[in-house]
């Protein structure tokens, strides 16, 4: 039976555990999560084990990245299942602080992100989101002091924002993006997929199918504006409320007029029922 990872819930216990992990000059990889772990998270852990000799997984449902009308209260919390998966994956340490540890009553500091990565995508529809993400990730980096940190590319804009923050603030952390892990029908794995009804789950892979078709058409030379309009129409016709379906430069997230403008990423966000799904694909 796999050995359960050590668990730290206070800063002193985290520091003691990290001192033990760093004995003999071990390198440390951090995988930040909000729990409700799936195979996408475990892919991050597998990559982490290749990149460092010790792996820390944080589990913290961060309230500051949720707006009042969003799903903080109902976000899946599956501690026992998560710990079983992390034991099987042979994770060394789980950092599981509570809200009071991360945000004491007198907490008064935020990290605000600017620049090209704030590109009118998630930041437009969830204006609170990146301030919360940058602040909690900055704290996790300060607490755990990892050599590398791994982020899934499903949250592509988040990956770019965190990479920029780590560079700008000289945090000394190498940020590694890990490709999206998908279900057999193409749906990007997400903890929020648990919200989908059977009918919604059957429709959800439409997003990936539309992006694959759009990417193929663009590679074949079709007009970008026409391709994106066709894809948006298909998404809406399938029953989604579309926030955006856009083609952006894969590095800067600047808008592009054609795939000749550089490496291109297609990004989508849409709601089916009350569940908001995001996805992206390279062209």
From Swiss-Prot:
Its main location: cytoplasm. InterPro entries: Cyt_trans-like, Pantoate_ligase, Pantoate_ligase_C, Rossmann-like_a/b/a_fold. One of its GO terms (molecular function) is pantoate-beta-alanine ligase activity. ATP binds at residues 34-41, 152-155, 181, 189-192. Pathway: Cofactor biosynthesis; (R)-pantothenate biosynthesis; (R)-pantothenate from (R)-pantoate and beta-alanine: step 1/1. GO terms for cellular component: cytosol. The active site is at 41 (proton donor). The keyword Ligase applies. Pfam families: Pantoate_ligase. Beta-alanine binds at residue 65. (R)-pantoate binds at residues 65, 158. It catalyses: (R)-pantoate + beta-alanine + ATP = (R)-pantothenate + AMP + diphosphate + H(+). Its EC number is 6.3.2.1. Catalyzes the condensation of pantoate with beta-alanine in an ATP-dependent reaction via a pantoyl-adenylate intermediate. This is Pantothenate synthetase. It comes from Nitrobacter hamburgensis (strain DSM 10229 / NCIMB 13809 / X14).
């Amino acid at each position: 039976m796999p050995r359960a990872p050590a668990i730290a819930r206070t800063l002193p216990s985290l520091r003691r555990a990290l001192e033990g992990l760093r004995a003999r000059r071990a390198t440390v990889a951090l995988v930040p999560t909000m729990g409700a772990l799936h195979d996408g998270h475990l892919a991050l852990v597998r990559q982490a084990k290749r990149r460092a000799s010790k792996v820390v997984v944080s589990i913290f449902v961060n309230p500051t990245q949720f707006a009042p009308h969003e799903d903080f209260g109902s976000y899946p919390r599956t501690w026992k299942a998560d710990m079983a998966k992390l034991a099987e994956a042979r994770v060394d340490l789980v950092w599981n602080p509570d809200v009071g540890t991360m945000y004491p009553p007198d907490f008064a500091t935020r990290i605000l992100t600017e620049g090209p990565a704030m590109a009118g995508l998630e930041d437009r529809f969830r204006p609170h989101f990146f301030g919360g993400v940058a602040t909690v990730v900055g704290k996790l980096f300060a607490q755990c002091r990892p050599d590398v940190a791994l982020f899934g590319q499903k949250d592509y804009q988040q990956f770019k924002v965190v990479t920029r923050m780590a560079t700008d603030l000289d945090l000394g952390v190498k940020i590694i993006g890990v490709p999206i892990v998908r279900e057999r029908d193409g749906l990007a794995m997400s903890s929020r997929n648990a919200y989908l009804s059977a009918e919604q789950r059957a429709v959800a892979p439409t997003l990936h199918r539309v992006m694959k078709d759009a990417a193929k058409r663009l590679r074949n030379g079709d007009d970008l504006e026409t391709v994106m309009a066709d894809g948006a129409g298909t998404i809406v016709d399938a029953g989604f409320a579309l926030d955006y379906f856009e083609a952006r430069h894969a590095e800067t997230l600047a808008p592009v007029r054609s795939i000749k403008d550089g490496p291109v990423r297609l990004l989508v966000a849409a709601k089916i029922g009350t569940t908001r799904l995001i996805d992206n694909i390279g062209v």
